Regions:
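Context-gated lysine
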Residues: 2, 9, 16, 43, ...
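Short, charge-rich amphipathic segments
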Residues: 29-37, 56-59, 63
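The conserved cystathionine-beta-synthase
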Residues: 15-32, 38-40, 88-106, 113, ...
C-alpha cells in the first residue's frame, strides 16, 4: 500500500509567521502554489492556504488594514491569518488514510511531519495524480 511519504513533495516551500501577505501572494503566483506551511525552524506552527488568502480581506486584522487604503498586504502578516491547528501526517501514513483525513477535516493538503519536523507536503491534487498514474499502469 502506498504511503504519504511516497507521494509527498519535498522540499517544501514554506512561510514564516512574520512574512508579509504581499510576499506570500507573490510567491503563490510565482510558484503556482496554494498551500504554505508556516514554520518556526523545522516545526509547523500554522498553514496558509489559497482559501486563507482569499478570505484575508474579511479577516478583522487585514480588513482594518484594507480600510487604511495603504498597501495593506505589505503591512499584514502571515501570522494574522494562518490556521494554527494544523492537521499533519507522518510519512508512513497510507494514502487511503490521508484521503480520509483530508475529507474528514475538509482540507486540501497535509504537511508531512517526521519527528516534529516538516519533511514534505501532499495535496489533494497530488493524490489524484498518483491515483490516475496507478490506474494508467493497471490499464496499460
Amino acid at each position: 500500500m502506498k504511503t504519504v511519504g511516497q507521494v509527498m513533495k519535498s522540499p517544501v516551500v514554506t512561510a514564516k509567521a512574520g512574512d508579509t501577505l504581499a510576499d506570500l501572494v507573490t510567491l503563490s503566483r510565482q510558484r503556482h502554489m496554494g498551500h504554505f506551511p508556516v514554520v518556526e525552524g523545522d516545526k509547523v506552527i500554522g498553514i496558509i492556504t489559497d482559501r486563507s488568502l482569499r478570505e484575508a480581506s474579511t479577516h478583522p486584522a487585514v480588513y482594518n488594514l484594507l480600510l487604511d487604503l495603504l498597501a495593506s498586504l505589505d503591512r499584514g502578516l502571515v501570522e494574522q491569518i494562518m490556521i494554527r491547528d494544523v492537521i499533519t501526517a507522518p510519512p508512513e501514513t497510507p494514502v487511503v488514510d490521508a484521503v480520509k483525513l483530508m475529507r474528514e477535516h475538509r482540507i486540501g493538503c497535509l504537511p508531512v511531519v517526521k519527528d516534529g519536523k516538516l519533511v514534505g507536503i501532499v495535496t489533494a491534487s497530488d493524490l489524484l495524480w498518483d491515483l490516475a498514474a496507478q490506474e494508467g499502469q493497471r490499464q496499460g
